[in-house]
């Protein structure tokens, strides 16, 4: 007797293919939702930073600051953003239109890409790459090209000089920054941002790389401020010398991209300081149960949500503490000259960062022996 199972096989193949297609479709939807959620969250974070900076600077200068747009003026930054969107987009008549238009996008897009490898919790990360920290350094090195394009495409001497200064400054401080990241990677035996946080959480509060790499932390802090072009490291935008630097000819939404990009970069730097030196989402306070310890108490889906929320809150709290220090630095220290800035990067920070890397490597070799 011969059984005809051709129809059954076809039906099984069709059901299997449909299930695979639905699974791929759901994964695609999940990726899109995750990316959009990150973009919205980061944009809201920038609005909070702008409001905090205005309030803190007002307090330092004994002013009130924004107070009419919403409670305590909290939506003043949103109102300013809408105003920039509605402004006319002026293009220089004799400038290079293509370079002028593409420059702001090349500056902003790498900053958004940096958020892919930032962990806000144990499993809250868009892309857990094995070379996460190097990915951040690689994409951030693209931004100087956009600054040069913006300065050259404006057909303005002040813009061009500002673009040259910005590119030189970014290249100068990218190297000490990368050397500090290498030192952290040697201590953690990994280039993954998640593994770096896990390596710190093994030893609690005393395991933070802030205590194991104090010199590297100071170099990373100074270099990140210079990368973000924050005072006292903002010669590319020195008003007394270059009007507004490479932003001089920009208006409307393109100027808004530069404005948002600078704060996005500042938030990225603060988050990486948190991940690399301050233990990331790990709290590690004595006698206070952390998320890892609570896992033994609660094991249902509700705990996963609570754990994720706690991790996000801890990470953002540490990042905003670093932002507070950056804002205080901006409003209390004078601007340095461009020659002093480059000398600091090449003649002081680079040799010290190299020495710190050699000491870290020697220490790791001794441990292996």
UniProtKB/Swiss-Prot annotation:
Lineage of the species this protein comes from: Eukaryota, Viridiplantae, Streptophyta, Embryophyta, Tracheophyta
Superkingdom field: Eukaryota
Keywords linked to the UniProt accession: Chloroplast, Membrane, NAD, NADP, Plastid, Plastoquinone, Quinone, Thylakoid, Translocase, Transmembrane, Transmembrane helix
Sequence intervals crossing the membrane: 29-49, 97-117, 129-149, 167-187, 205-225, 255-275, 305-325, 348-368
GO molecular function annotations of the record: NADH dehydrogenase activity; oxidoreductase activity, acting on NAD(P)H, quinone or similar compound as acceptor; quinone binding
Disulfide cysteine pairs (residue numbers): none
Organism of provenance: Angiopteris evecta (Mule's foot fern)
Assigned GO CC terms: chloroplast thylakoid membrane
Top-rank EC class of the record's enzyme: translocase
Compartments where located: Plastid, Chloroplast thylakoid membrane
Annotated catalysed reactions: a plastoquinone + NADH + (n+1) H(+)(in) = a plastoquinol + NAD(+) + n H(+)(out); a plastoquinone + NADPH + (n+1) H(+)(in) = a plastoquinol + NADP(+) + n H(+)(out)
Protein name as annotated: NAD(P)H-quinone oxidoreductase subunit 1, chloroplastic
Assembly description: NDH is composed of at least 16 different subunits, 5 of which are encoded in the nucleus.
């Amino acid at each position: 007797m011969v059984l005809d199972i051709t129809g059954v096989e076809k039906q099984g193949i069709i059901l299997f293919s449909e299930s695979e297609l639905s699974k791929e479709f759901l994964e695609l939807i999940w990726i899109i939702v995750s990316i959009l959620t990150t973009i919205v969250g980061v944009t809201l974070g920038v609005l909070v930073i702008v409001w905090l900076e205005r309030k803190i600077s007002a307090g330092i200068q004994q002013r009130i600051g924004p107070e009419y747009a919403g409670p305590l003026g909290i939506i003043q930054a949103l109102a300013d953003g809408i105003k920039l969107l509605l402004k006319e987009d002026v293009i220089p008549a004799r400038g290079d239109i293509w370079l002028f238009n593409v420059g702001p996008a090349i500056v902003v897009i790498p900053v958004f890409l940096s958020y892919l490898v930032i962990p806000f919790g144990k499993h809250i990360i868009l892309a857990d790459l094995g070379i996460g920290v190097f990915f951040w350094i690689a994409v951030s090195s693209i931004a100087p090209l956009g600054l040069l394009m913006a300065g050259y495409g404006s057909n303005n001497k002040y813009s061009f000089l500002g673009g040259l200064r910005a590119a030189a400054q970014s290249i100068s401080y990218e190297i000490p920054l990368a050397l500090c990241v290498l030192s952290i990677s040697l201590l953690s035996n990994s280039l993954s941002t998640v593994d770096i946080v896990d390596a710190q959480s093994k030893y609690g509060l005393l395991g933070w790389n802030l205590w194991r790499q104090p010199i590297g932390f100071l170099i990373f802090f100074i270099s990140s401020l210079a990368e973000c072009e924050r005072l006292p490291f903002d010669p590319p935008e020195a008003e007394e010398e270059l009007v507004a630097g490479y932003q001089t000819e920009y208006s409307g939404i393109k100027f808004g991209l530069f404005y948002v990009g600078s704060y996005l970069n500042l938030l990225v730097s603060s988050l990486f300081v948190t991940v690399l030196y301050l233990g990331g989402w790990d709290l590690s306070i004595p006698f206070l149960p952390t998320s890892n310890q609570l896992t033994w108490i609660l094991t249902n889906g509700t705990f996963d949500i609570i754990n994720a929320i706690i991790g996000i809150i801890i990470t953002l709290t540490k990042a905003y503490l670093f932002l507070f220090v950056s804002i205080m630095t901006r409003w209390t220290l004078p601007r340095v000259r461009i020659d002093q800035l480059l000398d600091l990067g090449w003649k002081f920070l680079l040799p010290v960062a190299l020495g710190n890397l050699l000491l870290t490597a020697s220490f790791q070799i001794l441990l292996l022996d």
